[in-house]
């Protein structure tokens, strides 16, 4: 049977150890996959599925060339798969029986080291999560490509999900005992690959990495991470930096849904960077600066001192335009130091990459000189503590040529004069080749054959080639025939064979010695890992700061003043993304005034008028302020927010089977549970996913709860105009609206937010813009006129006497049918028809998904039957 062959037995034994990975099994010049791996890989990679054996014993198989395997591996990694690379670890010539094979590494989405397989300006974090007996969670994360490692602790599962969303997590390693339901939720919410690791003891030799960590829980979490890395990578992790502890109250908390709603690092629909806040503020010119910027955007600060330190740096760079522009030019020539250092430690850096390291380090003196000219005392003091690695530059300048090949096994890497023995071999090789050229001329003169030439191939070595017409001119007995061609003969002489041996031996010695010397140089570079990492961190921060200064100058941002009180005062605020994507000069700036008595702004106004943009604008300005960037406004005074919560837009959670309304309620619940008076809450159209009266009741109850219990700064947009009466009942509620005017039957949206309530929603007009049939919109106009002319839903006349509680709006009982009188011969509207019309008028067309629209239509249809 095919499965019983020695080779297949070997395959099955190795595959049993890597059941959750594709096993790339090296056979000659190919990586082969067998059985289920082959069937699945052929489908995913769109390659031919063949077989081994015949009939029922035929084993499915497919393969990829080893020299182009990276392309196929990257495609599988993008889909979240793991790949075990199994190589031949002995020379087939020396093998007794089946060639010995071993898995030399396990490549997973969180352990990629090849720069071609990862995004340049994104981290590639592997995360280990340990669930403890008290249901708290320890989180350890590391980027194998840069060496960065961090740990944190959260108290419950919802917080775990939101914490993981704050980093570029590609793979999560779980402790044993997770339910399939919880694991599925994690996989679906974050689109990550899941793995498992039982061991959690800190491996010996790595204790020094944890000097900043004291909590046993965090040591267990980091131990699990290291155990997984050592098991999968099968090599030392000496480039991992000392682990940093992230205390729970040092960064602004932004939950997973809010990150997506605000489009912090990617757009909601297309999942692209362009159109996100990160895109709007990214003026970095190095890969490592881009990664640090993304981390800052994902984790805004709470420390006023640190925020103002960053602001001071931005101001210094803003005040020195020419030095900043020169600095940008210098930084453009700096390669990715962090990932180059990672490859040095990992042992897979090549000569060309070490030259990139050298060229980067050669730029450091000019970079530091420009920064010193800018004159910020804080950064200049830090520059004095940075090792510029000048001795490393000297080593790399003397050892490596300027343009070495990518391969480290072909020679051509080491500079002349670096090693005496190598120079000796090179002299022999070069002089030997000169001797060959001289011999060719000498043979031509001796034989009189002008076309005689000396050539070389790998089969016969050096040879003398003579055309058949000139063979008679050769001296008999001196030339030994080696090969016959159609029109020529090839010969060797004793003299030529002797010189050939000398030349070829020298060239083989050169290649081997260069390889050995390169490994020695690479090993010496490892001694500089820590100073190189510190240097890379400094360069990264300088790049982010100059980027903030550049974007602030280009787009006229201002330095926000941080308030000790909770007041918000923004003059001429703008949405940093929207103002960039609309035609120049068309963006309408808006003020935000949220002092005492205005902690909750109740926003009404037409669809398409810009309510959602206004709400997001405030959140993004707050986040920009707390990462240290200047903000898009004429003037800004801001408090420091501990958390931001948003519920904006509507989209069914199809993966979990949850409706829009359920998702809306879950997100609102999380905000109401977690928010403090120092938080910012944005709620858009809460309650629209249920019936009118249920929705209004919920909306009012939520506003009252925020007002009385949380007291957080809140923007609450609604189409329930009845809620505007709350301004008279709740001391911190203020009505504002987005204005619009009608001109000759056309509605003009002014996009300006002003005090007071809106008089109309213009839902039917927006329906016309959306292209609904005229017969539908005309009928809606008629019905709306009847409703407005007959009777409106009003607040109950009943008031609660002798109490300080605010009056409740009576939203639950419709007026009796008799109150509505028909016009002409038309039948009076039923309660259901009134409810449907009210709902139709309230629909936000632009932010309603096709699925939600179908659901609403079905709901209205059921009511009207």
Curated annotation (Swiss-Prot):
Residues 814-833 are annotated as: Disordered. PROSITE patterns: DNA_MISMATCH_REPAIR_2. SMART domains: MUTSac, MUTSd. One of its GO terms (biological process) is mismatch repair. ATP binds at residues 605-612. Keywords: ATP-binding, DNA damage, DNA repair, DNA-binding, Nucleotide-binding. InterPro entries: DNA_mismatch_repair_MutS (IPR005748), DNA_mismatch_repair_MutS-lik_N (IPR007695), DNA_mismatch_repair_MutS/MSH (IPR017261), DNA_mismatch_repair_MutS_C (IPR000432), DNA_mismatch_repair_MutS_clamp (IPR007861), DNA_mismatch_repair_MutS_core (IPR007696), DNA_mismatch_repair_MutS_N (IPR016151), DNA_mismatch_repair_MutS_sf (IPR036187). GO terms for cellular component: cytosol. GO terms for molecular function: ATP binding; ATP-dependent DNA damage sensor activity; damaged DNA binding; mismatched DNA binding. PANTHER family: DNA MISMATCH REPAIR PROTEIN MSH1, MITOCHONDRIAL, DNA MISMATCH REPAIR PROTEIN MUTS FAMILY MEMBER. This protein is involved in the repair of mismatches in DNA. It is possible that it carries out the mismatch recognition step. This protein has a weak ATPase activity. HAMAP family: MutS (MF_00096). Belongs to the DNA mismatch repair MutS family. NCBIfam families: mutS1, PRK05399.1. This is DNA mismatch repair protein MutS. It comes from Halalkalibacterium halodurans (strain ATCC BAA-125 / DSM 18197 / FERM 7344 / JCM 9153 / C-125). The gene is mutS.
């Amino acid at each position: 049977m095919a499965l019983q062959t020695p080779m297949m037995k070997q395959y099955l034994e190795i595959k049993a150890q890597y059941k959750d990975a594709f096993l790339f099994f090296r056979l000659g010049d190919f990586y082969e996959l067998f059985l289920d791996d082959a069937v699945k890989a052929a489908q995913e990679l769109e390659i031919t599925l063949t077989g081994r054996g015949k009939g029922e014993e035929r084993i499915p198989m497919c393969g990829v060339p080893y020299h182009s395997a990276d392309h196929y591996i990257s495609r599988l990694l993008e889909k979240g798969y793991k790949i075990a690379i199994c190589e031949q670890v002995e020379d087939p010539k020396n093998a007794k029986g089946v060639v010995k094979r071993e898995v030399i590494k396990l490549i997973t989405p969180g352990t990629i080291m090849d720069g071609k397989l990862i995004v340049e300006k994104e981290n590639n974090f592997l995360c280990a999560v340990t669930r403890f007996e008290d249901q708290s969670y320890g989180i350890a994360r590391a980027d194998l490509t840069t060496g960065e490692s961090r740990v944190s602790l959260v108290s419950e599962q919802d917080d775990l999900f939101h914490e993981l969303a704050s980093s570029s997590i590609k793979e999560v390693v779980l402790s044993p005992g997770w339910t399939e339901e919880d694991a599925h939720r994690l996989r679906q919410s974050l689109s990550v690959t899941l793995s498992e690791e039982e061991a959690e003891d800190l491996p010996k030799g790595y204790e020094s990495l944890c000097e900043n960590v004291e909590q046993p829980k965090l040591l267990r979490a980091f131990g699990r991470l290291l155990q997984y890395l050592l098991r999968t990578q099968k090599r030392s992790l000496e480039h991992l930096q000392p682990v940093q502890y992230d205390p729970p109250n040092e960064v602004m908390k932004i939950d997973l849904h809010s990150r997506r709603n605000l489009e912090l690092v990617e757009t909601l629909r297309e999942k692209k960077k362009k159109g996100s806040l990160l895109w709007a503020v990214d003026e970095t010119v190095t890969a490592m600066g881009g990664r640090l910027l993304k981390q800052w955007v994902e984790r805004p600060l709470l420390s006023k001192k640190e925020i103002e330190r960053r602001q001071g740096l931005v101001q210094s760079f803003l005040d020195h335009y020419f030095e900043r522009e020169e600095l940008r030019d210098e930084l453009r020539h700096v390669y990715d130091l962090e990932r180059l250092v990672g490859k040095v430690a990992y042992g897979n850096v090549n000569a060309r990459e070490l030259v990139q390291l050298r060229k980067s380090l050669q730029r450091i003196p000019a970079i530091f000189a420009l920064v010193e000219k800018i004159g910020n005392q804080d950064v200049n003091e830090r520059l004095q503590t940075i090792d510029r690695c000048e001795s490393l530059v000297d080593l790399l300048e003397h050892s490596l040529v300027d343009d070495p090949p990518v391969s480290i096994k072909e020679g051509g890497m080491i500079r002349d004069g670096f090693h005496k023995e190598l120079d000796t071999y090179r002299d022999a090789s070069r002089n030997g080749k000169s001797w060959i050229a001289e011999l060719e001329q000498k043979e031509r003169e001796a034989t009189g054959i002008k076309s005689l030439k000396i050539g070389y191939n790998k089969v016969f070595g050096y040879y003398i080639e003579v055309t058949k017409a000139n063979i008679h001119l050769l001296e008999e007995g001196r030339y030994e025939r080696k090969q016959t061609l159609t029109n020529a003969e090839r010969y060797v002489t004793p003299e030529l064979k002797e010189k050939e041996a000398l030349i070829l031996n020298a060239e083989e010695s050169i290649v081997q010695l260069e390889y050995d010397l390169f490994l020695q140089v690479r090993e010496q570079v490892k001694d500089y890992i820590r100073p190189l990492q510190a240097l890379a961190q400094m360069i990264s921060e300088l790049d982010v700061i100059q980027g903030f200064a550049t974007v602030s100058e280009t787009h006229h941002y201002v330095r926000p003043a941080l308030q000790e009180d909770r007041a918000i005062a923004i003059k001429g605020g703008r949405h940093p993304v929207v103002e960039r994507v609309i035609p120049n000069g068309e963006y309408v700036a808006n003020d935000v005034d949220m002092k005492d008595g205005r902690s909750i702004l109740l926003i009404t106004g037409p669809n398409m008028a810009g309510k959602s943009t206004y709400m997001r604008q405030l959140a993004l300005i707050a986040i920009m302020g707390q990462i240290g960037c200047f903000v898009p406004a004429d003037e800004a005074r801001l408090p420091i927010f501990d958390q931001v919560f948003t519920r904006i837009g509507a989209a069914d959670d199809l993966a979990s089977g949850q409706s829009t309304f359920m998702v809306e309620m879950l997100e609102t619940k999380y905000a109401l549970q977690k928010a403090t008076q120092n938080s910012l809450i944005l709620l858009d159209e809460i309650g629209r996913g249920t019936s009118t009266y249920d929705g209004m009741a919920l909306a009012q109850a939520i506003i009252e709860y925020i007002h009385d219990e949380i007291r957080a700064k809140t923007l609450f947009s609604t189409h329930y105009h009845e809620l505007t009466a709350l301004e008279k009942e709740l001391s911190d509620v203020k009505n504002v609206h987005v204005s619009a005017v009608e001109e000759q039957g056309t509605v003009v949206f002014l996009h300006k937010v002003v005090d007071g309530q809106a008089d109309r929603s213009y839902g039917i007009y927006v329906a016309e813009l959306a292209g609904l049939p005229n017969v539908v919109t005309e009928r809606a106009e008629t019905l709306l006129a009847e409703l407005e002319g007959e009777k409106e839903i009003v607040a109950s006349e009943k008031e609660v006497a002798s109490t300080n509680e605010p009056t409740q709006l009576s939203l639950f009982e419709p007026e009796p049918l008799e109150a509505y009188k028909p016009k002409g011969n038309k039948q009076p509207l039923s309660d259901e028809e009134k409810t449907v019309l009210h709902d139709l008028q309230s629909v936000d067309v632009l932010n309603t998904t096709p699925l939600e629209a179908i659901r609403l239509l079905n709901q209205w249809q059921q009511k009207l039957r």
